[in-house]
């Protein structure tokens, strides 16, 4: 099993990702694809007159402020535009893909956060009423059914809360959870940079390898900028869960998954 998280920033080559994933799937490789959609969500939110707002948390992670209107836009883009675009591309390449959100069949269930801490002007504040949360349960029986029937699952937030509300959840954490649950051979994070950079945004400063026992060292955690912090935290979670290899790699190139598995990017092992 290989779990691939496809980022949602500008510059992602979805056609190349789909072609590579379909090729692996046709060779008999079991795959789970998880995707984002942040850049498209920002565009749609702006077009609808409800521009995005982001919160920076005390640990440095950045998340989308998700009121009910934002949640609806999030669902439009993640469950609709991006998910079905990937499914269409995979079908064109001969892979029998099926797209699901965490709401479908209670695939991803978690706890809605009652309050979110964030930093503004150097002060820690609390935001309430956000539709965000953390996935704690996966409907593995549903995924197993699809995998055994020969489908390629394409998965996306939102998840379902214990109160049966849609909640914006972190796709990087979902990918790490799935990789741990399935004892994946590898967890691949594809984004619009070639991996972790020692001197962001200088792509020549790519960090080629991080020893698995050192992934939580401050010197490596400090390399993660912006939303990359969540991917690194996902890698930490996966490593703790027994996943032997995590790769941060480039989604702008041809054959991005194969190249990641061959050692391109930043490899944690």
From Swiss-Prot:
Q: What class of enzyme is it?
A: transferase
Residues annotated as binding substrate: 64, 168
Cell compartment(s), UniProt:
Cytoplasm
Segments forming a coiled coil: none
Q: In which pathway does it act?
A: Amino-acid biosynthesis; L-lysine biosynthesis via AAA pathway; L-lysine from L-alpha-aminoadipate (Thermus route): step 2/5
Does the keyword field hold Cytoplasm?
yes
Q: What is the effect of changing residue 117 to E?
A: Does not bind LysW
Query: What positions does the entry give for ATP binding?
Result: 5-8, 78
Q: What is its main location?
A: cytoplasm
Q: Which UniProt keywords apply?
A: Amino-acid biosynthesis, ATP-binding, Cytoplasm, Kinase, Lysine biosynthesis, Nucleotide-binding, Transferase
Question: What does the UniProt entry list as the effect of changing residue 123 to E?
Answer: Does not bind LysW
List the GO biological process terms: L-arginine biosynthetic process; lysine biosynthetic process via aminoadipic acid
Task: Extract the CDD domains matched here.
Answer: AAK_NAGK-UC
Outcome reported for the amino acid change (mutating residue 111 to E): Shows reduced activity
Q: Which HAMAP family match?
A: LysZ
Q: What NCBIfam families does the database record attribute to this sequence?
A: argB, PRK14058.1-1
Q: What does this protein do, in the record's words? A: Catalyzes the phosphorylation of LysW-gamma-alpha-aminoadipate. Does not phosphorylate N-acetyl-glutamate.
Family that this chain belongs to: Belongs to the acetylglutamate kinase family. LysZ subfamily.
Which named protein is this?
Answer: [LysW]-aminoadipate kinase
Whichever gene encodes this chain, its name is: lysZ
